Every structure is written in C-alpha cells, then in structure tokens.
C-alpha cells in the first residue's frame, strides 16, 4: 500500500483509543530559537536544543524547526482537521531521531527518523503574549527568503496547549519529502486575530504581473485516508463520544454566546418592547437547559 500522505482529516469516531499511549515527555526548557525565516511559502524558526521522549517514542527526538501555517480568513488555516473542523492556523514542530541518525537529512530517509507535533491556533478575543514574541519578529523577514536572528527570549513550552492528549498516525511531511509520524494535540492555543493577520503581510517568493504577492494563505488540504491507515488517540473519551469532543466544545461555546446575546437583548428591551424581551428570556432558559444537558452527557462520557 502507498504511504499515507499528510495532512488528513481525523474522524474521532474512527480513531482507536489506546490508553497505552503514555503522556509525552517534552523537554523544551533548554530549546532556543536561533533564526527566523520567510521561505516565501511559510514562516520557519530554527531551534537549538530541546527534545521529546516517552509516549510511544523509542528514544529521544530532538527539535529542529517549527513551521507556521495560516489561511486568508480566521475561520480556516490549519493543515489537519478534526471532524472536518478547520482551525485558524497550525504550528508544526519538526523533530528527528538523533540517537540513530547523524543529521536531519539522514533521518528523513528512514521511516523512524521524523516526528512532527501539530499545535492548532484558534482566534479568540485575547492576545497571546507568548505567540506575540514570534509576531514581533515578522517585520525583519517581510520579503521572501529573508532570514534574521531571533532576538527575543522565547520559551516554546509556553505555546503548548493546556491538555496534552494526542492523536497519532503515520504519514509524511507536509511537502511529502519524507515519512513522518504525527502527534496532533486537538486542544488549540488561543491567539488574537491581529496576531494572525500579521502573517498575511509577508511577501511570497512569486510575483503577480510584477506586483508584490503576499502569503495570504499557505495551509494544505487534507488527503483521503488509505484503507490501512490507523489513527490512535491517547485518551479514553473517544470510546464513548458520539460527536467530536472538540467540535462539541465549540458548539457549546456558540450556544453560550447566543445565550448571553439573548440575555443582553432581554435587559435592553425589558422596559420598551416587553414582547421581544419575554421571547428573549425564554430563549435564555431553553439554551441554559440545553447547555446543562450537554455538559451532563459530556461528563458521563468522560467517566465511561
């Protein structure tokens, strides 16, 4: 069978829950960014130091680079999808097997040579002060093929999501130049829209009729799963879940925001248009009941 191409859409119902997949040991405390580069297609940051181990890994894999992907709009921009849900962006942390191979170039020739961690970016109302350290460097690499020293103290640990349960599958690097095992954290990190839009001001390596061309988007569309491709999950929630826990969380957030909007409408019109105000407060009660029932079901599923 041909190798599974990356990225993919992860269907949580079909993922195999395997609690034997232990938590990763992530040692980024000594990792230091050395340079940041606009390749004309993406932002790449080179690192020195830092490694991962544990989980299903046979030994230590050292951090080499991180790649950042985004889209034209905040609603999409990730390479991987969770139940066809696209995040605002994606960071790929590329590691290689230093114990077995002498270099990244040597490691990429082997199926156990490369491990890539995917961290999703989700636009929210608040700036991410840690991600801002990357954003602050972008002015120094506006043109394609520009590289500059990363001149800020930056701790990669601060970009890890709050929950480190993960999906994993065997695929390829995004440019399909090598086989790679993927570790995908479904819990995103939040950034502000202004932070993401800064990446769209970078210049591409291609020109359009002599005019500057911006990297407005660089994400890849997912590939169809091969018949023999298996996706595993390190937690237990997949066994009982009838819908994606990731998508359900965002649906619950949408319902909660709608409830707040209805309540604001009620407060605004209670002295004027009482009919509309009563309708609004009825919706508040209905949405509150739905959110309560969903949270109860979600709690039961986590316990099963």
Swiss-Prot record:
Per the record, ranges on the Virion surface side are 1-275
Q: Which residues cross the membrane?
A: 276-294
Gene Ontology CC entries for this record: membrane; viral envelope; virion membrane
Report the subcellular localization: Virion membrane
Q: Where does the UniProt entry say this protein principally localizes?
A: virion
Residue ranges occupied by any Alpha-carbonic anhydrase domain in the UniProt entry: 1-235
Keywords on record: Disulfide bond, Host-virus interaction, Membrane, Transmembrane, Transmembrane helix, Viral attachment to host cell, Viral envelope protein, Virion, Virus entry into host cell
The recorded induction information for this protein reads:
Expressed in the late phase of the viral replicative cycle.
Instruction: Give the InterPro entries listed for this entry.
Output: CA_dom (IPR001148), CA_dom_sf (IPR036398), Carbonic_anhydrase_a-class (IPR023561)
User: Which residues point to the Intravirion side?
Assistant: 295-304
Q: Name one GO molecular function term.
A: zinc ion binding
The biological process GO terms on file are:
symbiont entry into host cell; virion attachment to host cell
Q: Output the PROSITE patterns linked to this UniProt entry.
A: ALPHA_CA_2
Query: Which SMART domains does the entry mention?
Result: Carb_anhydrase
Q: How is it modified after translation?
A: Apparently non-glycosylated.
Q: Which family does it belong to?
A: Belongs to the alpha-carbonic anhydrase family.
Complex formation: Homodimer; disulfide-linked.
Q: Give the function comment from the record.
A: Binds to chondroitin sulfate on the cell surface to provide virion attachment to target cell.
Q: What is this protein called?
A: Cell surface-binding protein OPG105
Give the species. Monkeypox virus (strain Zaire-96-I-16)
């Amino acid at each position: 069978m041909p190798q599974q191409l990356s990225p993919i859409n992860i269907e949580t119902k079909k993922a195999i829950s395997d609690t034997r997949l232990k938590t990763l040991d992530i040692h980024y405390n000594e990792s230091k960014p050395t340079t940041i580069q606009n390749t004309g297609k993406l932002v790449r940051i080179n690192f020195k130091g830092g490694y991962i181990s544990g989980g299903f890994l046979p030994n230590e894999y050292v951090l080499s680079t991180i790649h950042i992907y985004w889209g034209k709009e905040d609603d999409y921009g990730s390479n991987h999808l969770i139940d066809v849900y696209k995040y605002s962006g994606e960071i790929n942390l590329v590691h290689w097997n230093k114990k077995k191979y002498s270099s990244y170039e040597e490691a990429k020739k082997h199926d156990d040579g490369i491990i890539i961690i995917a961290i999703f970016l989700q636009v929210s109302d608040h700036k991410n002060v840690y991600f801002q350290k990357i954003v602050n460097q972008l002015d120094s690499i506006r043109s394609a093929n520009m590289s500059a020293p990363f001149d800020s103290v930056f701790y990669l640990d601060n970009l890890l999501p709050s929950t480190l349960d993960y999906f994993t599958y065997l695929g390829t690097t995004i440019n399909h130049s090598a086989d790679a095992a993927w570790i995908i954290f479904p819990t995103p990190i939040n950034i502000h829209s202004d932070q993401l839009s800064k990446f769209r001001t970078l210049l591409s390596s291609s020109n359009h009729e002599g005019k500057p061309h911006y990297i407005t988007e660089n994400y890849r569309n997912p590939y169809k799963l091969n018949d023999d491709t298996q996706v595993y999950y390190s937690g237990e929630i997949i066994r009982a879940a009838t819908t994606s826990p990731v998508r359900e969380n965002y649906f619950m957030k949408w319902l909660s925001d709608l409830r707040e909007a209805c309540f604001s409408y009620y407060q605004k019109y209670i002295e004027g248009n009482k009919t509309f105000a009563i309708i609004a407060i009825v919706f508040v009660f209905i949405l509150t009941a739905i959110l309560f029932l969903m949270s109860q079901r979600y709690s039961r599923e986590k316990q099963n």
